[in-house]
Amino acid sequence: MFALGTIVNTLAILGGGVFGALFGKMLGPRQQETLTRTCGVCSMFIGLSGTLEEMLSVQDGHIVTSGSLLMIICLAIGALIGEMLNLEGAFERFGTWLKVKTGNAKDQRFVDGFVTASLTVCIGAMAIVGSIQDGIQGDPSILLAKSVLDLIIIAVMTCSMGKGCVFSAIPVAVLQGSVTCLSRLIQPIMTEAALSNLSLVGSVMIFCVGVNLVWDKRIRVANLLPAIVIAVVAAFLPF
């Protein structure tokens, strides 16, 4: 079946979200707050581990770092572009529209839950590489593995942040479905260097999502999204 990985991933997010919404009703405000902070700490460590994996290497028995300047440039330029386009505002407006259309107008956490969950499950190399592999080879194995992770993540996030997290299935379906359909065009661009850059910058953004969950919303992470495109382009520049 074409785009099987994306279909399963979308259903996994919906399933995890429904389970989380039902279980979340049994939790009090204190438990929900603690669970949100816990999700944030986990996201921070996942982002940190992904960042260090791309930045650290062993040469001649010594640990060396690389990619620091690339990371700074990509995130700085990406942030400027994102702020000018106000991508965070676009996410929030779509979340507000969804909140009204789905009958959740009184849910004050809906938009934050939608934006945070969407960024968490969309950012990362697994979504891109898995979609390309599914489109070209018909092998959904990477996206199936991602589906298991996303099911757990969204179930936990929905418990603490509400039903808005369930609708993160929409951007996942759009992003991964689009990449799968365009996989033959995208594959030559996603070289090893491009994927490494994407993973580095994406991991930093996942860390930022965790920071927002732990210390309330302080970083407009969606406005950093152009940094991912810049990171991929940077892989083809002669420096």
Segments and roles (model prediction):
Residues 1, 29-30, 87-113:
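Intrinsically disordered, low-complexity non-transmembrane regions of multi-pass membrane transporters
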Residues 39-55:
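A generic, lipid-embedded transmembrane alpha helix
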Residues 53-64, 129-134, 183-192:
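Membrane-interface helix termini and inter-helical loops of multi-pass transporters
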Residues 49-54, 82-97, 210-219:
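Transmembrane helix exit motif
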Residues 99, 108-187:
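Helix-loop-helix junctions within the multi-pass membrane cores of secondary transporters/permeases
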Residues 8-16, 20, 24, 40-41, ...:
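Alpha-helical transmembrane segments in multi-pass membrane proteins
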Residues 31-41, 95-97, 165-175, 222-229:
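Cytoplasmic-side transmembrane-helix entry/capping segments in multi-pass membrane proteins
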Residues 2-15, 66-73, 135-147, 190-204:
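Structural signature of hydrophobic alpha-helical transmembrane segments
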